[in-house]
A protein has these predicted regions:
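Active-site catalytic motif of lipid deacylating hydrolases and related acyltransferases
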Residues: 1-17
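Low-complexity, repetitive regions of proteins mediating host interaction that are extracellular
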Residues: 12, 36-37
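Structural motif
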Residues: 18-20, 47
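Gly/Ala-rich beta-loop-alpha elbow adjacent to hydrolase catalytic centers
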Residues: 20-25, 29
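Active-site signature of alpha/beta-hydrolase-fold catalytic machinery across serine-
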Residues: 31-35
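Helical cap/lid subdomain of alpha/beta-hydrolase-fold lipid enzymes
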Residues: 37-213
């Protein structure tokens, strides 16, 4: 991650920087802050999208598939989540409190959640995988319906509750003018690469980011 020249490498303090993180990148940064390896100075703005603060059931699913515990799985979902054997990155996203998440992982999640809530500036989550009209939209719809999510409110990969973990849910709004924006975008849409929807205010991630600047 590139930071400003005023940041302090000796203390790991990030100053005068705008951070945008998508998905697991925010969990990694939260864990680094919780472990004392990084500090977010008040002069820095941290913008986060689709953060799996409790993990993702996609990790549990791919581990079950690779362990032979799932039958009738869809090959395109496996391509989306990653192939067997499961790598360490995939395993590290096991959903908090489940059989694939160790006591140490559960504790690390809790610490990361506290660091996230205390330092993040603006957050984009999604309570629907309907998303924008793109070639991959059907794949994320399939993931949203097929994966064993705890809630139907998910972006295909990350549940709304996981993304908003540690933050008051009444602080979220479906207006792109809200710093805490609850959308109807799928997981890839929240990375901004597919632009904005035409009609719904709940599908305008780029406009949301512009309003933050």
């Amino acid at each position: 991650m590139q930071v400003s020249s005023s940041s302090d490498p000796a203390t790991g303090t990030i100053k005068d920087t705008i951070i945008f993180g998508h998905s697991m990148a925010n969990l990694i940064l939260s864990g680094s802050v919780a472990a004392g390896r990084a500090k977010i100075d008040p002069s820095t703005s941290w913008v986060a999208a689709s953060t799996p603060m409790e993990g993702s059931m996609g990790s549990n699913y791919i581990q079950e598939v690779c362990n032979g515990e799932q039958t009738g799985f869809v090959a395109t979902i496996i391509d989306l989540l990653g192939k067997c054997p499961v790598n360490s990155g995939q395993m590290s996203l096991a959903y908090q409190g489940t059989n694939f998440s160790s006591a140490g992982m559960n504790a690390a999640y809790a610490a990361a959640q506290a660091a996230y809530a205390s330092n993040v500036t603006a957050v984009l989550c999604s309570n629907s995988f309907s998303g924008l009209v793109t070639v991959k939209a059907a794949l994320y719809t399939l993931a949203g319906e097929l994966l064993p999510h705890h809630s139907s409110q998910n972006d295909g990969i990350v549940e709304y509750g996981s993304c908003a973990m540690g933050l008051p849910q009444d602080s979220f709004d479906n207006s792109y003018k809200s710093a805490r924006y609850v959308t109807e975008l799928n997981h890839v849409d929240t990375s901004f690469r597919n632009g904005d929807g035409v009609f719904s205010d709940a599908k305008k991630p780029v406009k949301w980011f512009e309003c933050l600047l």
